[in-house]
């Protein structure tokens, strides 16, 4: 959706502890349904800055889909602010934090870090990041900064 992307793709997600914790908090709050959202950042920067939790239109424990009107509003807002979706995240409630075939087929933002959080273990959330381009999934390290 964001045709202006002009940055480079790094092989690591650098994310602040605050944003990291907000993603996990959202995933736990929406459990047993999958949670979803984006973290916007300056276009081309690969720097996640603005946390945008979104509604799972499916309200499902096994599938997520952004509400189309909310997604349109959020992407327009990012365009207006010269931002892009640096992170697109969602949770898995009963399986590991690895993209499903559906997740892979829906991945349409080549610049984005696709973050998955598994909430299957109440004591400890599993947080992982991937690049998904052309159907290929590559896990990348996550650097949580203070």
Model-predicted segments: where are they?
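Metallo-beta-lactamase
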Residues: 91
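Conserved beta-strand-loop surface patch within small alpha/beta domains used
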Residues: 2-85, 94-146
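Conserved, mostly hydrophobic/aromatic
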Residues: 88
């Amino acid at each position: 959706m964001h045709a202006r992307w002009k940055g480079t793709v790094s092989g690591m997600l650098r994310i602040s502890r605050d944003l990291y914790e907000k993603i996990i908090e959202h995933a736990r709050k929406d459990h047993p349904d999958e949670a979803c959202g984006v973290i916007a950042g300056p276009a081309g920067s690969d720097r996640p800055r603005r946390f945008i939790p979104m509604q799972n239109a499916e309200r499902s424990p096994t599938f997520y889909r952004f509400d189309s009107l909310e997604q349109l509003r959020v992407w327009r807002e990012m365009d207006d602010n010269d931002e892009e979706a640096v992170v697109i995240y969602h949770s898995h409630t009963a399986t590991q934090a690895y993209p499903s075939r559906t997740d892979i087929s829906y991945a349409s933002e080549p610049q984005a870090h696709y973050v998955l959080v598994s909430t299957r273990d109440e004591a400890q959330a599993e947080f992982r990041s991937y690049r998904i381009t052309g159907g290929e999934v590559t896990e990348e390290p996550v650097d949580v900064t203070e």
